[in-house]
Amino acid sequence: MLREAGTPCVFWGDLFGTPETSDLPAVTELPLLMTMRRALAHGPQHDALDDPDVVGFAREGDEAHPGSGLAVVLSDRRAATKRLHVGARHAGEQWICVLGGHEPVTIGDDGNVELPVSDGGLSVYAPEAARPILDSAEQHLLRQR
C-alpha cells in the first residue's frame, strides 16, 4: 500500500468487511493507510532488508507534497528496532507511530532514525506535521462506523 512500486488494489471486503459470506471484519486501519498513500507516500524509497525477521522501508517525501514522507517497519518474530534513512530534509523533525504503541522519535541530522516495532508487529511512522491529514482520515473512519 505504501511502497513506491505498483498500484495497490483495495477490495470491498477489506474496507467494509464481509459479514454475509465470512467472519472476516473490515481492516480498520485501511482508510488511514489509503490516506497516507495519497498524501505522504512520495519521493525516493529506501529499503532495509538486512534482517530476514525485521524489514523496513522509508519514503523521503518531496517538495511537491509538503509534509510528505513515511517509514514502515515489520517484524515476524521479535520486538526490534530498524535504522532507516528518511531523508536529510526531515532532520530534527518529530515523527509519530500512526498505528499507536510507540513513542514519537526524532530524525537525526543525517536523516536517519531508529524505529521500534513490536513482536510480530507493524509500525508506520509519519511526520508530526502530517497529524492534521491523519486526524482527518481518522474522523472519516469514525463517521463510517
Where are the predicted features?
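Short, solvent-exposed loop/turn segments at secondary-structure junctions
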Residues: 15-18, 62, 76-79, 130-131
